Amino acid sequence: MKGVLKGLAVVVEDVEFARKLYKEGFYGRFLGYDKVRREEVDKISAPLILALYEALYLAERGKLKVVSKNGTEVLPEKLIELGREKIKNFDDIYKIYKYFRDLGYVVKSGLKFGALFSVYERGPGIDHAPMVVVFLEPDRGISATDITRGGRLSHSVKKTFTLATVSKQTGEVVLLGFSWAKL
C-alpha cells in the first residue's frame, strides 16, 4: 500500500491500510487524534500521518510505498535526501529511531516532554513510555545543564531521561540514561 509525500510527512489516506500500520507498531498519528489505543483503531476513519523517519523505516522494509502528489514513486534514497536537506542531523536522528525500533520498542514523538522521542515497550495506551530520548549532537559534549535537565525531567515525568548520539568513530548509537529515584 502507499502513502503520499506531503512536505516532510507521508499521508496514508487508505483508512484500512492506515489502521493496519498503526496496529502493527503504532506508526504515525491519525489526523485529528492525539493518542489512540489499539482497541479504538477500528473506529477511526482519518488519514494516518507519518513522520519522514517513520515512512523511511517502513519503506526500507517494504511495508510502505511512498509516492509524490502526482503518483510517482519516491524511493527511500530520495526520502533520505529530503531529510538531509530539511532536517538538521537527519542521519543521526533516523539512526537513533531505527535503533530503538529494531530492538522492538515503539517510538513516538517526545515533543510534549521536550524530547526527540518517547520510547514505549509495548505502545501508547498499553503502557507508559518508560524513556524519553533527547538528541545530543555528536560534536557537542555533555554539559552540566544537560545533566540537570535530565535529572529534573526524569523526576517530573518519572521516566528515564536518555541522551542519544551517534559515535563519529564507530557510527554506533551511544546512550546515556538518567533514571528517577526516590531517596
From Swiss-Prot:
Reactions the enzyme catalyzes: pretRNA = a 3'-half-tRNA molecule with a 5'-OH end + a 5'-half-tRNA molecule with a 2',3'-cyclic phosphate end + an intron with a 2',3'-cyclic phosphate and a 5'-hydroxyl terminus
Pfam families: tRNA_int_endo (PF01974), tRNA_int_endo_N (PF02778)
Keyword DNA-binding in record: no
UniProt GO molecular function: lyase activity; nucleic acid binding; tRNA-intron endonuclease activity
Enzyme's top EC category: lyase
Coiled coil regions, renumbered to chain: none
GO CC aspect terms: cytoplasm
Enzyme Commission number(s): 4.6.1.16
Catalytic residues as annotated in Swiss-Prot or TrEMBL: 120, 128, 159
One GO term (biological process): tRNA splicing, via endonucleolytic cleavage and ligation
Alphabetical UniProt keywords: Lyase, tRNA processing
Domain of life assignment: Archaea
SUPFAM superfamilies for the chain: tRNA-intron endonuclease catalytic domain-like, tRNA-intron endonuclease N-terminal domain-like
InterPro entries noted in UniProt: tRNA_endonuc-like_dom_sf (IPR011856), tRNA_intron_Endo_cat-like_sf (IPR036167), tRNA_intron_Endonuc_cat-like (IPR006677), tRNA_intron_Endonuc_N (IPR006678), tRNA_intron_Endonuc_N_sf (IPR036740), tRNA_splic (IPR006676), tRNA_splic_arch_short (IPR016442)
Family listed: Belongs to the tRNA-intron endonuclease family. Archaeal short subfamily.
PANTHER family (alphabetical): TRNA-SPLICING ENDONUCLEASE SUBUNIT SEN2 (PTHR21227:SF0)
Subunit description: Homotetramer; although the tetramer contains four active sites, only two participate in the cleavage. Therefore, it should be considered as a dimer of dimers.
UniProt name for this protein: tRNA-splicing endonuclease
Protein source organism: Pyrobaculum islandicum (strain DSM 4184 / JCM 9189 / GEO3)
Gene giving rise to this polypeptide: endA
